[in-house]
């Protein structure tokens, strides 16, 4: 039996990063928005104990298909934590991911796939699988995984995994320009530290939250920020040109998405999206452009029969 879950990408509307803490992590204050770019994650029971993972879709060859993939780890986590529900015979699972979310692009593609695999595995063995009920397990997999379950718009604190919903009136139109080359999140944080960091920088972006609540698009655009942007551009200077071109042709604002290298452009309407997309598509450092709206829902179980590992 197979369970399939649809998961959405994210963009950080604001990302405030504090200095490196003794535990090796940076405290964060971030506002997430889920975006209508989706992966689908299918988990199928096996009669033996093996776990396999296959990938299709955009840039599938760049996605690991072993235990280093967060989706694989999500299924293993459910199997370890709920051995009796999973099945007395120690069943395995086949995981398949159909990719549309950019790979290594700062849009939480790997975390979204982990959220999808977590929900699918829980549903297969008849465990509670609502986003709220899966939060403790999600936090064990990665900082972005809890938000990828819930979607919408949320304020994240701590490592980004302590979430509070944010009221968002209105919809946002985005253009995303992906890069020809990925950018390692740990490398970006290391460069952030080398550039001096921002001790105490994990502040709540009150102006942005107020603008979202009012549905004031221009105020939202004026309030977007990313403390990792300077580090990402220092590692990949060509990103600055992408941001500049998007602004020059009418984007309300432009910023690096999360740790990059994807560049995000907030636009007013469909015409603006087309103009920005056409302009940045001509740059040699841009792999492809995508238009999308937000906010989007979180992880969603797609219709179909649900089996059991019993």
From Swiss-Prot:
<feature type="binding site">
    <location>
        <begin position="102"/>
        <end position="112"/>
    </location>
    <ligand>
        <name>ATP</name>
    </ligand>
</feature>
<dbReference type="InterPro" id="IPR006204">
    <property type="entry name" value="GHMP_kinase_N_dom"/>
</dbReference>
<comment type="pathway">
    <text>Isoprenoid biosynthesis; isopentenyl diphosphate biosynthesis via DXP pathway; isopentenyl diphosphate from 1-deoxy-D-xylulose 5-phosphate: step 3/6.</text>
</comment>
<dbReference type="Pfam" id="PF08544">
    <property type="entry name" value="GHMP_kinases_C"/>
</dbReference>
<keyword id="KW-0414">Isoprene biosynthesis</keyword>
<keyword id="KW-0067">ATP-binding</keyword>
<dbReference type="InterPro" id="IPR036554">
    <property type="entry name" value="GHMP_kinase_C_sf"/>
</dbReference>
<keyword id="KW-0547">Nucleotide-binding</keyword>
<dbReference type="GO" id="GO:0019288">
    <property type="term" value="P:isopentenyl diphosphate biosynthetic process, methylerythritol 4-phosphate pathway"/>
</dbReference>
<dbReference type="GO" id="GO:0016114">
    <property type="term" value="P:terpenoid biosynthetic process"/>
</dbReference>
<feature type="region of interest" description="Disordered">
    <location>
        <begin position="289"/>
        <end position="310"/>
    </location>
</feature>
<keyword id="KW-0418">Kinase</keyword>
<protein>
    <recommendedName>
        <fullName>4-diphosphocytidyl-2-C-methyl-D-erythritol kinase</fullName>
        <ecNumber>2.7.1.148</ecNumber>
    </recommendedName>
</protein>
<comment type="similarity">
    <text>Belongs to the GHMP kinase family. IspE subfamily.</text>
</comment>
<comment type="function">
    <text>Catalyzes the phosphorylation of the position 2 hydroxy group of 4-diphosphocytidyl-2C-methyl-D-erythritol.</text>
</comment>
<dbReference type="GO" id="GO:0050515">
    <property type="term" value="F:4-(cytidine 5'-diphospho)-2-C-methyl-D-erythritol kinase activity"/>
</dbReference>
<dbReference type="Pfam" id="PF00288">
    <property type="entry name" value="GHMP_kinases_N"/>
</dbReference>
<feature type="active site">
    <location>
        <position position="10"/>
    </location>
</feature>
<feature type="active site">
    <location>
        <position position="144"/>
    </location>
</feature>
<keyword id="KW-0808">Transferase</keyword>
<dbReference type="InterPro" id="IPR013750">
    <property type="entry name" value="GHMP_kinase_C_dom"/>
</dbReference>
<dbReference type="GO" id="GO:0005524">
    <property type="term" value="F:ATP binding"/>
</dbReference>
<dbReference type="InterPro" id="IPR014721">
    <property type="entry name" value="Ribsml_uS5_D2-typ_fold_subgr"/>
</dbReference>
<dbReference type="InterPro" id="IPR020568">
    <property type="entry name" value="Ribosomal_Su5_D2-typ_SF"/>
</dbReference>
<dbReference type="InterPro" id="IPR004424">
    <property type="entry name" value="IspE"/>
</dbReference>
């Amino acid at each position: 039996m197979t369970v399939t879950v649809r998961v959405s990408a994210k963009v950080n509307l604001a990302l405030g990063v504090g200095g490196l803490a003794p535990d090796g992590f940076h405290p964060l204050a971030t506002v997430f928005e889920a975006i209508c770019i989706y992966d689908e994650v299918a988990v199928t029971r096996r009669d033996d104990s093996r776990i396999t993972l296959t990938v299709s879709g955009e840039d599938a060859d760049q996605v690991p298909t072993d235990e280093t993939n967060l989706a694989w780890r999500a299924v293993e986590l459910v199997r370890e934590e709920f051995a009796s529900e999973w099945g007395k015979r120690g069943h395995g699972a086949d995981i398949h991911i159909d990719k549309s979310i950019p790979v290594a692009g700062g849009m939480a593609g790997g975390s979204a796939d982990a959220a999808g695999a977590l929900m699918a595995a829980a549903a297969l063995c008849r465990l509670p699988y609502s986003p709220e009920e899966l939060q403790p397990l999600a936090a064990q997999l990665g900082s972005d995984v809890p938000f990828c379950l819930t979607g919408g718009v949320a304020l994240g604190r701590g490592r980004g995994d302590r979430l509070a919903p944010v009221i968002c009136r209105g919809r946002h139109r985005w253009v995303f320009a992906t890069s020809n080359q990925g950018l390692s999140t740990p490398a970006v944080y290391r460069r952030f530290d080398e550039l001096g960091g921002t001790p105490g920088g994990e502040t709540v972006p009150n102006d942005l939250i107020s603008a979202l609540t009012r549905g004031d698009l221009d105020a939202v655009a004026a309030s977007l920020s990313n403390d990792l942007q300077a580090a990402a551009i220092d590692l990949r200077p060509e990103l600055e040109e992408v941001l500049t071109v998007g602004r020059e042709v009418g984007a309300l604002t432009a910023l690096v998405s999360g740790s990059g290298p994807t560049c995000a452009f907030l636009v007013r309407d469909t015409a603006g999206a087309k103009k920005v997309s056409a302009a940045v598509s001509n740059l040699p450092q841009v792999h492809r452009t995508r238009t999308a709206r937000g906010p989007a829902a979180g992880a969603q179980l797609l219709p179909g029969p649900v089996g059991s590992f019993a």
